[in-house]
Amino acid sequence: MPHCIRGSEGWEIIPQLQEYAAHPIDKPTFGSQYLGSLLRARDEDLRRQGQPGVEKVTFIGVCTDICVISNALLAKAFLPEAEIVVDAACCAGVTPESHRTALRAMKACQIAVEHEGETD
């Protein structure tokens, strides 16, 4: 199912989040190894400067059961000590059941799920 195609309305970031869109990542498919590399590089840069590394990464978006789960798991693999969070109230799956299944799978992989059930 094509979605979030560059230049389409679904690809645009809503005005309320524009200020956080400093470095959007265009990914060729649902999982972004580039995102993992960026997170690891940022973590290493912070540690070289004597600061704590990346401590928390929060994911929102669609589709919970495709893009969100893929990228949350990649982030956990690249930053195993960081807190990886998915805000379930800001996600949607292909179906409500696949959304819930993806949330359960992420929790089983030590990814925190916030606001689960708040929009069901």
Where are these regions (language model features)?
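Active-site-adjacent betaalpha module
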Residues: 1-120
